[in-house]
Amino acid sequence: MSQIAFDPPYVPRSQCDQALAVHGYAVLHADDVMGWVPASREELAQLHRAWDDLPADAYLKDGGRYRRRRHSCFVIEGAQVTQVPHRPHWQPLAYNALHGGMQRWFEPMAADMLALPVWTRLLQRLGATATALHGERPWFVEAHPFRIDTTDGIGRPTPEGAHRDGVDLVAVFMLDRHAIKGGESRVFAADGPAGQRFTLWQPWSLLLLDDARVIHETTPIQPLVPGELGWRDTLVLTCRRDGFQSA
């Protein structure tokens, strides 16, 4: 159970590409995500099991212990999905003032999870959405399974603050909220005052972002009951043209 302040501005699956093109973001209800991938609830639940085995993030510069994660990279060309040799996650300081400018080597995602057919379908759909938005080309995808918890009392999903990622498309899948309050998503136009705030709460609901046009952040989480551990599980996928970001 968790506290919800503002419901997401869901759009029908049939209007997803149009909403992305017009507004720079789109939010899909979990039922629409199942049709979008396509996938059953059981298949998506199989993917989520891997979140119970995420190592701690050793790179947090604020000294926190609240983030657990893995990281793997892929190339999508049409329907072809290829995992690339394990590589570090790197962002320039211009996009991540807190953790940019350094190579961060996270443990790779579990092989048994990546072998699930639903994982390939999910990446294929992501590539098709990026192509609808930006045109056909190879897409360089970084996958980040995250668990933010309340070990330190407060967990910060985006310790770097409101930001862009330096990619073409960002997908944030909400997998689970357990015994927390906070974790509000905020999306702002990169070139103006327009913005939205809402709380992703439904397992496997989805926020899609045209990274060039919007800035995003998620507010900190706190436990609903003091002393009781809470957490927020997400899967973040980024698509970038012309290669992975590198030093």
Where are these regions (language model features)?
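Catalytic core of Fe(II)/2-oxoglutarate
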Residues: 183-247
